[in-house]
Amino acid sequence: MGEMTAIRDAYGAALKELGEQDVRIVGLEADVASSTKSGIFGSAFPERYFNVGISELNMVAMAAGLARTGFIPFVNTFAVFLTTRGADPVQSLIAYDSLNVKLCGAYCGLSDSYDGASHQAITD
C-alpha cells in the first residue's frame, strides 16, 4: 500500500500540475491558501493567483468574469462559505450561463471540527 497523502496536499499539487499544462488556469482564494493548499499554485504562478480576502461572494463574481474572458478559474475556500456566502453568484453568474468555473470547497460536512461550528458545512 502506498503512502497516504492528505486530500488538501494532493489538491494543491494537482492544481499546480494543471497550471503547468494550461496557462488559462487561474486560482482565486478567500484568505485560505495554507488551509486549502491552493497556495502551492499561487507560489508557482503568482501572476495567475488572486487572494481576494474573506469575500466569497466577490470571489465567485470575479471567477465568472474571468471565465467569460477565456480563463479557467479555480475558486478555493471552505465549503461552508462557498455554499452560503457564494451561493447567489454561483447560481446567477455561473450556473445559468454554464461557465467553466471550478468551485473547490474544502472541509465539507463536519470535517473541520477544530475551527468550530462556524466552519462546519452541515448544509453543503
Where are these regions (language model features)?
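Thiamine diphosphate
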Residues: 1-124
